[in-house]
Structures are given as C-alpha cells and as structure tokens.
C-alpha cells in the first residue's frame, strides 16, 4: 500500500498540530507548512517521526504569492501527489474600523481566501485515486469581526 499524503497549512501549532498528531502514523506522509513557528514545527516533526510518519516542513508567508508558489513547488517535489489538503492557516490582526489599513485588508484576503483557493487548485491537479479530501478550516472572525470593529464609542 502506498503512503497517504497530507498537506496541512498552519500545521505547527494549535489546531493544525493537533490534526497532524491525530493523523500521523505508519504509511502517512505529512507536509507541514509554518510561517513564524519554526522551532515548534521542528519539534512536531520529531514527534510525528517517532510515530512512523515521514514529515516535511516548509516555511512561507501565505499572503505572498512567491511564497505560495514555493510551497506548491516543494509539495509537488516531496509528495508527488496528494490525498488530503487541510487549509488551516489563517491571519487575524487585532484591528478596528478606525485603524485598519488597505494593506492589512489585502493581506487578510490573500491569506484567508486567495491562498486556500490556489492550494485547492494545485491539489485538484495532483490527486491520485478517488478518496481525496480538501478540508477548509476558517476562524469565526470571518463572520464576526474583532469585537467592536464597527463600534466607535
């Protein structure tokens, strides 16, 4: 049997790390994306390898197109094809209506919307078989902005 191949964005900490731990084991290859959590990613890699998983780490800022392209290229070179993509990474800066910037707004949209779509497109082009999954995890703040975002008192 060929190994199952999983990509997890934002996989080094919190929910992403918990998912990686739950899915890891023999015959599992996991590519973990991280941005700023290098030491946590490296520690998680060691933990998952002890459970029998083959683990790859890739760093990248999901708001930057060149980093997203690098992640896609790395994923293709290491895994060849994919069984599961978990779009878990997100960006939520603490801002309010009176101080948010168009740069911040754009970074949020690129990280939380555009990049999961681009990664899903790449995934769809590199699947093998029929039992493949894309799981999109989104924070509640997309639906409910920072408390009092539009409240000025």
Where would I find each of the regions flagged by the language model?
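Conserved glycine-rich Rossmann-like NAD(P)H-binding loop of the short-chain dehydrogenase/reductase
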Residues: 28-42
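Catalytic loop of short-chain dehydrogenase/reductase
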Residues: 133-153
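Substrate-binding pocket helix/loop in short-chain dehydrogenase/reductase
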Residues: 96-97, 104-109
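Active-site loop of short-chain dehydrogenase/reductase
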Residues: 4, 53-54, 81-82, 126-140
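The beta1-alpha1 cofactor-binding region of Rossmann-like NAD(H)/NADP(H)-dependent oxidoreductases
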Residues: 38, 59-70, 102
């Amino acid at each position: 049997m060929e190994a199952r191949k999983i990509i997890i964005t934002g996989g080094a900490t919190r929910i992403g790390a918990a998912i990686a731990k739950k899915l890891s084991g023999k015959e599992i290859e996991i590519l973990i994306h991280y941005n700023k959590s290098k030491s946590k990613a490296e520690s998680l890699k060691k933990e998952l390898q002890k459970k029998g998983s083959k683990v790859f780490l890739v760093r990248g800022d999901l708001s930057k197109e060149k980093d997203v392209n690098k992640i896609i290229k790395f994923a293709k070179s290491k895994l060849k094809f994919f069984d599961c993509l978990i779009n878990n990474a997100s960006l939520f800066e603490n801002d309010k209506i009176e101080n948010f910037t168009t740069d911040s707004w754009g970074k949020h949209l690129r990280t939380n919307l555009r990049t999961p779509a681009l990664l899903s497109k790449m995934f769809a082009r590199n699947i093998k078989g029929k039992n493949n999954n894309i799981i999109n995890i989104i924070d509640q703040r997309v639906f409910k902005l920072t408390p009092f975002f539009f409240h000025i008192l």
